C-alpha cells in the first residue's frame, strides 16, 4: 500500500477503522441510558394517602423513605424460643405507589409449619407472587417459616385484601399490641459507637438498619430501602449487658463470602443464605445470623461484616 496518502484519505481510513469499535460500544451505552430513562419511580406519599389500605387491614402503618407505607403484624400470640431466648416475631407488608399509577406490595409472613401451606394457597389465590420460603432461626420452638411475597396492581386496596386473606390463614392477632418501651441494660451507646450508627428502641429491642448504596430496581421499578432492601440487626437484651443478636445482611454476590467469613471470625453463627426476591437488580442475597454474647463484643464483630458491604446507616 502506498504510504503517501493525502490527509483526506487518511481521515477516511481512520474513520473506517474506528467505526466498528464505536458500533460495538454505542448500543450498550445507549441501552444503559434507555434503562435509566425507563425506570419507574416511587411517588411521595403521606399516611392519609393510605387510608383505604389501613381500613382493609384494620390497622395503621407508617410512611418510611417518604414513599413506603409499611404495616407490621406482630405475632404476640406466638412466643418463639431459641437457645433459651424468647422472641416475638412478626410479618410485614410494604406498599409503594409509582408514577405509572400502580402500587407495589412486598413483604413477608412469619408462620408456623401448620400455617405455611394455607398461607401459600391464600397468597396464590390473591394474585400475590411467592418469592422465597425459608427459616430465619436455628433450632427453635414452635417451628417457624417465612414466606416472602410481592405483587402490583392499580388498586392498593385490592393488594391489601390479598394480604389480609393470607394473614387470615394464620392466627396472627387482628389488632396490634400495646406500645411499650421496656428498659434495657444493654450498653447501647457503646454498641452504637462500634457500629457507627444510631439504633432505635423497638419494644426493648435495639435495632439497626443499613441501606444499600446502589439503586435497586425490579422490572424497572425503583425499590426504596423500606421495601426490604436493607441489612437489619437486632439486639435482644438477655441480662448482664449480654445480648442475643439476629437479623440479616443484604449483599450482592461479590460480597457474600467476605461477609460470611467475617461473621464466623467474630463467633457469630450463620443461619441461612438465600434470596428474598426473584428479579431485583442488582441481585441481592441475604445472610441470617445468630449469637449470644456481650453486646459490645457482638457489635464489633458485626461491624467487620458490615465493612464488607456497600451499605450506609439508615436515616
Task: Please state what every model-predicted region is.
Residues 79-96, 214-237:
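Intrinsic, low-complexity N-terminal interaction/targeting segments
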Residues 6-7, 26-52:
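C-terminal segment of N-terminal export signals and the immediately downstream linker at the start
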Residues 60, 111-133, 139-181, 185, ...:
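Hydrophobic, ordered structural segments
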Residues 41-44, 75-76, 108-115, 181-182, ...:
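Short, surface-exposed ligand-recognition loops at beta-strand->loop->(often short) alpha-helix junctions
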Residues 1-7, 18-21:
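N-terminal secretory signal peptides
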Residues 51-86, 100-107:
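An N-terminus-focused feature that recognizes amino-terminal "leader" regions
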Residues 96-106, 236-246, 308-315:
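Structural motif
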Residues 87, 113-138, 253-276:
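Extended intrinsically disordered, low-complexity coil regions enriched in Ser, Thr, Gly, Ala
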